[in-house]
């Protein structure tokens, strides 16, 4: 860590690796959840970028037109880790965390209710069934979803750079059409946490 330079690392990553006055390892990678959205549709509808619960709800109301276009594809498969990641991202964005420095945290009733109501809204704008990362990526890549929450691992696929998961918005598996119509948000804000936050691993 010292050879690479302390200033080349985020403080949070160094804190996680700290042990007995030194570092147990070198933090080498990490990722967060992103709101991936169709910027072309947002621009055409005059919608704000979806960086808050309110902006996402407004976009769902404007763009949800199933089966051609779903406003969102949110994970609903409760035994799939992806749903836990997305739900925790949504919780943290509203200042809700099940843990604190002392262990388990008491959940704030108002903020938690806001989280659950918001999650219900995005689930209601999703296709029916048990959904997880696979369906959200497939629907977005087919041009049938206005928004999803996904990790940065989707970015190379979105650009047509991964043969096993190509965009299907047109007949060219290496097409960058969808990438050119997409933008991402890294920090989401809820009504009880206007500064926003994000889940990270």
Where do the protein language model's features map onto the residues?
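Extracytoplasmic/periplasmic substrate-recognition and gating elements
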Residues: 44-45, 121-127, 166-201
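Beta->alpha turn/N-cap motifs
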Residues: 133, 150-155, 187-188
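Extracytoplasmic/periplasmic solute-binding protein
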Residues: 15-28, 33, 55-104, 111, ...
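Short helix-initiation/N-cap motifs at beta->coil->alpha
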Residues: 53-57, 128-141
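Hinge/lid segment of periplasmic solute-binding proteins
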Residues: 1-32, 83, 174-188, 193-196
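Extracytoplasmic "Venus flytrap"/periplasmic binding protein-like
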Residues: 1-9, 40-51, 146-147, 157, ...
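Glycine-centered hinge/linker elements that transmit conformational signals in sensory
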Residues: 60-62, 101-130, 181-183, 187
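Sec-exported extracytoplasmic/periplasmic mature domains
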Residues: 39-40, 47, 61-68, 92-96, ...
């Amino acid at each position: 860590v010292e050879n690479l330079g302390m200033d080349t690392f985020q403080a949070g990553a160094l804190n996680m690796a700290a042990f007995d006055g030194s570092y147990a390892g070198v933090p080498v990678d990490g990722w967060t959840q992103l709101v991936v959205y169709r910027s072309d549709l947002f621009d055409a509808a005059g919608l704000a970028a979806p960086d808050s619960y309110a902006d996402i709800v407004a976009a769902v109301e404007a763009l949800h037109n199933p089966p051609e276009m779903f406003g969102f594809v949110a994970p609903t498969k409760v035994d799939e880790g992806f749903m836990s990641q997305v739900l925790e991202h949504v919780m943290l964005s509203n200042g809700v965390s099940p843990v604190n420095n002392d262990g388990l945290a008491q959940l704030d009733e108002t903020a938690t209710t806001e989280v659950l109501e918001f999650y219900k809204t995005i689930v209601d704008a999703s296709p029916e069934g048990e959904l997880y990362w696979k369906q959200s990526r497939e629907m977005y890549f087919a041009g049938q979803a206005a928004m999803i929450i996904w990790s940065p691992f989707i970015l190379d696929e979105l650009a047509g750079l991964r043969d096993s998961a190509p965009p299907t918005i047109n007949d060219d598996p290496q097409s960058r059409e969808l990438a050119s119509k997409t933008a991402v948000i890294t920090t989401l804000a809820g009504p009880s946490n206007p500064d926003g936050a994000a889940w990270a691993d």
